[in-house]
């Protein structure tokens, strides 16, 4: 389940509004958001196509999924829900 979305563009999942996200990222981002909505734990997202991995250091407790190239969806998980779902450019 998705608890909170941090990135305005990812609200496309709630409102089906694609204007806040690059067109080449929309399809994969929608797949990731649908999978997050259906997940009960971060490990549910450990599919090869998402390249799931936990972050370390000061980002410990945050997980990352690859959208395309250097673009990632990051999130925290608590009580069977994803929080602070964000779209980040890892440059």
Model regions: which residues?
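Basic, Lys/Arg-enriched alpha-helical interface segments
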Residues: 1-66, 78-91
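Catalytic-pocket segment enriched in acidic/His residues
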Residues: 75
């Amino acid at each position: 389940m998705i608890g909170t979305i941090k990135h305005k563009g990812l609200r496309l999942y709630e409102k089906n509004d694609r204007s806040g996200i690059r067109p080449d990222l929309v399809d994969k981002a929608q797949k990731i958001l649908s999978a997050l909505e259906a997940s009960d734990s971060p490990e549910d997202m450990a599919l090869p196509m998402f390249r799931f991995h936990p972050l370390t250091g000061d980002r410990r407790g945050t997980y990352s999924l690859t959208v395309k190239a250097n673009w990632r969806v990051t999130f925290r998980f608590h009580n069977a829900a994803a929080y602070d779902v964000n779209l980040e450019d890892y440059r």
